[in-house]
Protein backbone atom coordinates (compact mmCIF):
# COMPACT_ATOMS: atom_id res chain seq x y z
CA UNK A 1 0.00 0.00 0.00
CA UNK A 2 1.69 3.25 -1.10
CA UNK A 3 1.30 6.01 1.47
CA UNK A 4 2.13 9.66 1.94
CA UNK A 5 2.17 11.54 5.25
CA UNK A 6 -0.74 13.97 5.39
CA UNK A 7 -0.84 14.80 9.11
CA UNK A 8 1.45 14.37 12.10
CA UNK A 9 -0.23 14.64 15.49
CA UNK A 10 0.81 14.18 19.11
CA UNK A 11 -0.04 10.47 19.22
CA UNK A 12 -0.46 9.39 15.59
CA UNK A 13 0.76 9.99 12.05
CA UNK A 14 -1.84 9.83 9.27
CA UNK A 15 -1.01 8.56 5.77
CA UNK A 16 -2.85 8.36 2.47
CA UNK A 17 -3.51 5.05 0.73
CA UNK A 18 -4.26 4.12 -2.87
CA UNK A 19 -7.95 4.50 -1.98
CA UNK A 20 -8.85 8.17 -1.48
CA UNK A 21 -11.50 7.16 1.07
CA UNK A 22 -9.08 5.25 3.33
CA UNK A 23 -6.15 6.33 5.51
CA UNK A 24 -3.52 4.58 7.61
CA UNK A 25 -3.13 5.71 11.22
CA UNK A 26 0.29 4.95 12.72
CA UNK A 27 0.49 5.08 16.51
CA UNK A 28 3.55 6.74 18.05
CA UNK A 29 5.47 6.05 21.23
CA UNK A 30 5.10 9.69 22.24
CA UNK A 31 3.20 10.58 25.41
CA UNK A 32 1.98 14.15 25.90
CA UNK A 33 0.00 15.97 28.56
CA UNK A 34 -1.29 19.49 29.16
CA UNK A 35 -1.65 20.12 25.40
CA UNK A 36 1.92 19.08 24.68
CA UNK A 37 3.63 20.97 27.52
CA UNK A 38 4.78 17.65 29.02
CA UNK A 39 6.20 15.29 26.42
CA UNK A 40 8.15 12.02 26.50
CA UNK A 41 9.01 9.07 24.25
CA UNK A 42 7.84 5.84 25.88
CA UNK A 43 8.85 2.62 24.11
CA UNK A 44 5.94 0.29 23.43
CA UNK A 45 3.18 2.84 23.97
CA UNK A 46 2.20 2.99 20.29
CA UNK A 47 1.77 -0.78 20.07
CA UNK A 48 -0.41 -0.89 23.19
CA UNK A 49 -2.59 2.03 22.11
CA UNK A 50 -3.13 0.46 18.70
CA UNK A 51 -4.01 -2.91 20.24
CA UNK A 52 -6.45 -1.40 22.74
CA UNK A 53 -8.09 1.02 20.31
CA UNK A 54 -8.43 -1.60 17.57
CA UNK A 55 -10.04 -4.00 20.05
CA UNK A 56 -12.53 -1.41 21.35
CA UNK A 57 -13.44 -0.14 17.89
CA UNK A 58 -14.01 -3.69 16.62
CA UNK A 59 -16.43 -4.28 19.50
CA UNK A 60 -18.17 -0.96 18.83
CA UNK A 61 -18.55 -1.86 15.15
CA UNK A 62 -20.11 -5.20 16.08
CA UNK A 63 -22.44 -3.40 18.54
CA UNK A 64 -23.75 -1.24 15.70
CA UNK A 65 -21.80 1.96 16.32
CA UNK A 66 -20.67 3.60 13.08
CA UNK A 67 -16.90 4.14 13.30
CA UNK A 68 -13.97 4.87 11.01
CA UNK A 69 -12.21 1.63 11.96
CA UNK A 70 -11.65 -0.91 9.17
CA UNK A 71 -8.88 -3.22 10.39
CA UNK A 72 -5.63 -3.49 12.33
CA UNK A 73 -2.76 -3.70 9.83
CA UNK A 74 0.28 -4.18 12.07
CA UNK A 75 1.47 -3.64 15.63
CA UNK A 76 1.31 0.14 15.21
CA UNK A 77 -0.92 0.65 12.16
CA UNK A 78 -4.62 0.51 11.45
CA UNK A 79 -6.72 1.15 8.36
CA UNK A 80 -9.42 3.78 8.82
CA UNK A 81 -12.09 5.44 6.74
CA UNK A 82 -11.12 8.98 5.83
CA UNK A 83 -13.28 11.54 7.61
CA UNK A 84 -13.55 15.29 7.89
CA UNK A 85 -12.99 15.73 11.61
CA UNK A 86 -15.52 17.84 13.52
CA UNK A 87 -13.40 20.26 15.59
CA UNK A 88 -14.94 19.19 18.89
CA UNK A 89 -13.74 17.03 21.73
CA UNK A 90 -16.85 15.36 23.12
CA UNK A 91 -16.24 14.49 26.77
CA UNK A 92 -18.53 12.27 28.83
CA UNK A 93 -18.15 12.13 32.60
CA UNK A 94 -19.54 9.33 34.78
CA UNK A 95 -17.61 10.52 37.84
CA UNK A 96 -15.96 13.76 38.90
CA UNK A 97 -12.25 13.94 38.04
CA UNK A 98 -9.57 16.03 36.40
CA UNK A 99 -10.54 19.45 35.06
CA UNK A 100 -14.16 18.96 36.15
CA UNK A 101 -13.13 18.62 39.80
CA UNK A 102 -10.78 21.57 39.49
CA UNK A 103 -13.35 23.77 37.74
CA UNK A 104 -16.07 23.18 40.32
CA UNK A 105 -13.91 22.67 43.41
CA UNK A 106 -15.14 19.14 44.15
CA UNK A 107 -13.37 15.92 45.08
CA UNK A 108 -12.55 13.33 42.45
CA UNK A 109 -14.52 10.09 42.26
CA UNK A 110 -18.04 11.37 43.00
CA UNK A 111 -20.59 9.42 40.92
CA UNK A 112 -22.72 11.67 38.74
CA UNK A 113 -26.42 10.83 38.87
CA UNK A 114 -26.65 11.44 35.13
CA UNK A 115 -23.51 11.29 32.96
CA UNK A 116 -22.51 14.78 31.83
CA UNK A 117 -21.55 15.49 28.20
CA UNK A 118 -19.25 18.44 27.54
CA UNK A 119 -17.86 20.03 24.38
CA UNK A 120 -14.35 21.43 23.95
CA UNK A 121 -13.33 23.41 20.87
CA UNK A 122 -10.40 21.65 19.17
CA UNK A 123 -7.97 24.54 18.81
CA UNK A 124 -4.43 24.25 20.18
CA UNK A 125 -3.85 28.01 19.95
CA UNK A 126 -6.81 28.58 22.28
CA UNK A 127 -5.94 25.61 24.54
CA UNK A 128 -9.11 23.67 23.55
CA UNK A 129 -11.64 25.82 25.47
CA UNK A 130 -14.76 24.43 27.14
CA UNK A 131 -17.79 25.56 25.10
CA UNK A 132 -21.57 25.09 25.11
CA UNK A 133 -24.15 24.27 22.44
CA UNK A 134 -24.65 27.93 21.54
CA UNK A 135 -20.91 28.39 21.00
CA UNK A 136 -20.88 25.30 18.76
CA UNK A 137 -23.63 26.83 16.62
CA UNK A 138 -22.01 30.30 16.61
CA UNK A 139 -18.73 28.80 15.39
CA UNK A 140 -20.73 26.93 12.72
CA UNK A 141 -19.25 23.62 13.84
CA UNK A 142 -22.62 21.85 14.05
CA UNK A 143 -26.34 22.56 14.05
CA UNK A 144 -29.03 21.57 16.55
CA UNK A 145 -29.69 18.12 15.07
CA UNK A 146 -25.99 17.31 14.79
CA UNK A 147 -25.35 18.46 18.36
CA UNK A 148 -28.21 16.28 19.60
CA UNK A 149 -26.84 13.31 17.64
CA UNK A 150 -23.31 13.76 19.04
CA UNK A 151 -24.67 13.75 22.58
CA UNK A 152 -27.00 10.81 22.00
CA UNK A 153 -24.32 8.70 20.29
CA UNK A 154 -21.78 9.51 23.01
CA UNK A 155 -24.23 8.40 25.69
CA UNK A 156 -24.95 5.19 23.75
CA UNK A 157 -21.24 4.45 23.44
CA UNK A 158 -20.84 5.11 27.16
CA UNK A 159 -23.44 2.49 28.06
CA UNK A 160 -21.55 -0.11 26.03
CA UNK A 161 -18.12 0.84 27.38
CA UNK A 162 -19.24 0.97 31.01
CA UNK A 163 -20.48 -2.62 30.82
CA UNK A 164 -17.34 -3.91 29.09
CA UNK A 165 -14.96 -2.25 31.55
CA UNK A 166 -17.06 -3.29 34.55
CA UNK A 167 -16.74 -6.91 33.39
CA UNK A 168 -12.96 -6.67 33.75
CA UNK A 169 -13.02 -4.82 37.07
CA UNK A 170 -12.40 -1.30 35.80
CA UNK A 171 -14.50 1.80 36.43
CA UNK A 172 -14.95 4.14 33.45
CA UNK A 173 -14.56 7.59 35.02
CA UNK A 174 -14.69 9.73 31.89
CA UNK A 175 -13.54 9.79 28.27
CA UNK A 176 -13.06 11.98 25.20
CA UNK A 177 -14.38 11.13 21.74
CA UNK A 178 -13.94 12.69 18.32
CA UNK A 179 -16.32 12.39 15.40
CA UNK A 180 -16.11 13.18 11.70
CA UNK A 181 -18.09 13.20 8.47
CA UNK A 182 -17.49 10.23 6.16
CA UNK A 183 -17.58 10.39 2.35
CA UNK A 184 -21.39 10.29 2.42
CA UNK A 185 -21.68 13.09 4.97
CA UNK A 186 -22.61 10.74 7.81
CA UNK A 187 -21.26 11.45 11.29
CA UNK A 188 -19.15 8.52 12.53
CA UNK A 189 -16.86 7.91 15.49
CA UNK A 190 -13.20 8.62 14.67
CA UNK A 191 -9.80 9.01 16.35
CA UNK A 192 -9.10 6.34 19.00
CA UNK A 193 -10.23 4.86 22.29
CA UNK A 194 -7.40 4.02 24.65
CA UNK A 195 -6.17 4.96 28.13
CA UNK A 196 -4.80 8.09 26.42
CA UNK A 197 -8.30 9.55 26.12
CA UNK A 198 -10.21 8.02 29.02
CA UNK A 199 -9.89 7.61 32.77
CA UNK A 200 -10.04 4.11 34.20
CA UNK A 201 -9.78 3.23 37.89
CA UNK A 202 -9.43 -0.22 39.38
CA UNK A 203 -11.28 -1.43 42.49
CA UNK A 204 -8.65 0.19 44.73
CA UNK A 205 -8.89 3.56 42.98
CA UNK A 206 -5.59 3.17 41.15
CA UNK A 207 -5.29 5.11 37.90
CA UNK A 208 -5.09 2.84 34.85
CA UNK A 209 -4.76 5.59 32.25
CA UNK A 210 -2.66 8.56 31.12
CA UNK A 211 -3.01 10.22 34.53
CA UNK A 212 -0.12 7.92 35.48
CA UNK A 213 2.01 10.01 33.09
CA UNK A 214 0.34 13.36 33.85
CA UNK A 215 0.78 12.97 37.60
CA UNK A 216 4.00 10.95 37.68
CA UNK A 217 2.39 7.92 39.32
CA UNK A 218 4.46 5.17 37.70
CA UNK A 219 5.34 3.51 34.40
CA UNK A 220 2.73 4.24 31.73
CA UNK A 221 3.27 1.09 29.67
CA UNK A 222 2.98 -1.15 32.75
CA UNK A 223 -0.52 0.22 33.34
CA UNK A 224 -1.54 0.07 29.66
CA UNK A 225 -0.32 -3.53 29.49
CA UNK A 226 -2.59 -4.45 32.40
CA UNK A 227 -5.56 -2.80 30.67
CA UNK A 228 -4.78 -4.69 27.45
CA UNK A 229 -4.48 -8.02 29.27
CA UNK A 230 -7.80 -7.43 31.03
CA UNK A 231 -9.57 -6.47 27.79
CA UNK A 232 -8.58 -9.77 26.23
CA UNK A 233 -10.68 -11.51 28.89
CA UNK A 234 -13.73 -10.12 27.05
CA UNK A 235 -13.00 -12.25 23.97
Curated annotation (Swiss-Prot):
Keyword match Cell division: no
Catalysis performed (reactions): 5-amino-1-(5-phospho-D-ribosyl)imidazole-4-carboxylate + L-aspartate + ATP = (2S)-2-[5-amino-1-(5-phospho-beta-D-ribosyl)imidazole-4-carboxamido]succinate + ADP + phosphate + 2 H(+)
GO biological process, one term: cobalamin biosynthetic process
Enzyme Commission (EC) number: 6.3.2.6
Record CDD domains: SAICAR_synt_PurC (cd01415)
Primary enzyme class: ligase
Alphabetic keyword roster: ATP-binding, Ligase, Nucleotide-binding, Purine biosynthesis
GO molecular function, one term: ATP binding
Metabolic or biological pathway, per its Swiss-Prot or TrEMBL entry: Purine metabolism; IMP biosynthesis via de novo pathway; 5-amino-1-(5-phospho-D-ribosyl)imidazole-4-carboxamide from 5-amino-1-(5-phospho-D-ribosyl)imidazole-4-carboxylate: step 1/2
Pfam families listed in its UniProt record: SAICAR_synt
Domain of life, source organism: Bacteria
HAMAP family: SAICAR_synth
UniProt similarity note: Belongs to the SAICAR synthetase family.
NCBIfam families in UniProt: purC
Database matches in PANTHER family: MULTIFUNCTIONAL PROTEIN ADE2, SI:DKEY-6E2.2
Name of the molecule in the record: Phosphoribosylaminoimidazole-succinocarboxamide synthase
Gene that encodes it: purC
Amino acid sequence: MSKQLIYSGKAKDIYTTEDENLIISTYKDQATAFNGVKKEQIAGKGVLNNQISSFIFEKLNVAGVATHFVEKLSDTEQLNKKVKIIPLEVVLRNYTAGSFSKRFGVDEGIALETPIVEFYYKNDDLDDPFINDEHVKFLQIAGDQQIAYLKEETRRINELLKVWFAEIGLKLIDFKLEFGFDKDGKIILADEFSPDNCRLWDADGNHMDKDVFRRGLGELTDVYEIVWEKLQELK
